[in-house]
Amino acid sequence: MAASRIAVDAMGGDNAPEAVVEGAIQALHQTEGELSVLLVGPEEQLHGLLASRPEAPEERLRIVDAPEAIGMGETPSTAVKQKPNSSIHQGLAAHHDDHADAFVSAGNTGAIMAASMFILQRIPGVERPSIAGFFPTLKGSSVVLDIGSNVDCKPAHLLQFARMGTVYARQVLKTDPPSVGLLNIGEEPGKGNEQVKAAHELLRDADDVHFVGNVEGGDLLFYAADIIICDGFVGNALLKFGESMSTVLSDMCQQEMERQGLAPDEQKLVAGVLDEVREGFDPEALGGAPLLGVNGNVLVGHGRSTADVIAQMIHSARTIATENVAHALEEAFQSSSA
């Protein structure tokens, strides 16, 4: 894999900056010299954290001073305009100016989206950039677009999500051609509201999308398609359901083991199996959600991301940069508009 420079928002997330710095160090130790990290945040504070970590590979770590931070509760558009020296703004600027090949943040999702649109700009032809998520199934994770960045969508937007998801799956997941399903209340083409019925027609007629038809909610866990298309309102609810599902099932099993009076060693054995299942159903293990449709490589993480998740996000960002997803999207939208 080619050498990559990843800009990381050191102030993004509930556990920042400590977990972010720890995650960056982990990622660097997990690779050879072909990876370097730009930690973006208050210079003095970050120097202090690194000084207490003598094992940090300083030759592959650089600090980009960003004295301001955008909080999780701040209004995205206002924060981006009023805080040009924030870690999100400066990290994206480093990517835009080619000092970094990708940008990673577990910070305010709306601010990341707004700043990316402002600094990196949309790819020509893309009306709505989309954040893609991953829904756990029995056969791996399906890519879901959109997961909350676009709650009100036109049918044409859903078609664009399908095109972006197709490029991502082909470039990063090496699935060719990836299957695309439209989340609906029934499998028949005439099912759904007006938005979904119109989107079905557009997807059916698109020659650059491998559309397999409508997908019902009950089929999602059985891997109905490589890519699932829906608006961000539905997608966000779906993703959060997936995040909580394994925890609830695990707790229910624990309660049942106690009710049946299983011995401690028996409970430990079952708990080990459940932990493996939970890990397989953990969308964070895949390393962040890609923001598709802007002129750059941006990964968005959950606010509660741990050091392990930050490290995985850095590796995922490196893959997206190496596979040049943004350029592939640009080519795809040029072809679709021709």
Curated annotation (Swiss-Prot):
Highest taxon of source: Bacteria
GO cellular component terms, A-Z: cytoplasm
SUPFAM superfamilies in the cross-refs: Isocitrate/Isopropylmalate dehydrogenase-like (SSF53659)
NCBIfam families listed in its UniProt record: plsX
Catalysed conversion reaction: a fatty acyl-[ACP] + phosphate = an acyl phosphate + holo-[ACP]
InterPro entries, per database record: FA_synthesis (IPR003664), Phospholipid_synth_PlsX-like (IPR012281)
Function of the molecule: Catalyzes the reversible formation of acyl-phosphate (acyl-PO(4)) from acyl-[acyl-carrier-protein] (acyl-ACP). This enzyme utilizes acyl-ACP as fatty acyl donor, but not acyl-CoA.
SUBUNIT field: Homodimer. Probably interacts with PlsY.
Pathway: Lipid metabolism; phospholipid metabolism
One GO molecular-function entry: phosphate:acyl-[acyl carrier protein] acyltransferase activity
Annotated protein name in UniProt: Phosphate acyltransferase
Top EC class for this record: transferase
Keyword terms: Cytoplasm, Lipid biosynthesis, Lipid metabolism, Phospholipid biosynthesis, Phospholipid metabolism, Transferase
EC number, UniProt record: 2.3.1.274
Membership in a protein family: Belongs to the PlsX family.
Subcellular location(s) per record: Cytoplasm
GO biological process: fatty acid biosynthetic process; phospholipid biosynthetic process
